[in-house]
């Protein structure tokens, strides 16, 4: 970051989500000073935090890795319900959790997990949690580093669930943070080459094509870093594939027409960018995936949609390898 005020504002990244914006308003978090006093600028991506110079408080008192989360704030973040007007704990990661979908962090014993809902309000809404599970399944079959996902009902809402992949020792920095201005695929490849190799980035791009992931962007992939030194360790495991595997497709949609209307955020088309970045090792993975079939994720997932997702996988692999 260039300016400390910009950094603080960035820690309030979740405030555009309706429930979080309402919560921050109810808690009186209207200024940077309010936000620092209440939330300490804490996040689960690193170990930075803030306090007043004269404040008698330590990292052990506020760490999101060491303290219980505020269940009320988590519930509000997830579905917009909860108890307002009460004293809330500062140890909540919700204020600094990015993304437009309603979500919350929960601690179950030593495990911290993210629960994320699907969309609402229209006929083809709500399939995004299934997409996370399906994407994780094909990434597992391809032996590609990824965050595992399951699906469950949480407070009566369908949600995907995945474990936290950072810790007090290892943090996460999204890709766009490493570039001062606009950047393209060649810039990212060069950056990866300078930090251990570009195979993982190439795998991500090709597998996004296989999964028809329409929402891969520089905020939902990045690198693991040493929280003590800031040094880059490696590319982070793949996560946030809730817009892969045709979540918005409807039963009456023509398959070929639908595929022709969607594309990636990185590259001109799924097939062209995958062909440009594929390597011999990745090609071998795609050949092996010809025999792979997605399994029913359960929880009411429609049979027609499962068939469409498998058909999409077959089509994408055939076109990439052609």
Question: Where do the language-model regions lie?
Answer:
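Phosphate/dinucleotide-binding and metal-coordinating scaffold of catalytic cores
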Residues: 1-212, 224-322
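Conserved protein-kinase catalytic-loop segment immediately C-terminal to the catalytic Asp
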Residues: 217, 222-225
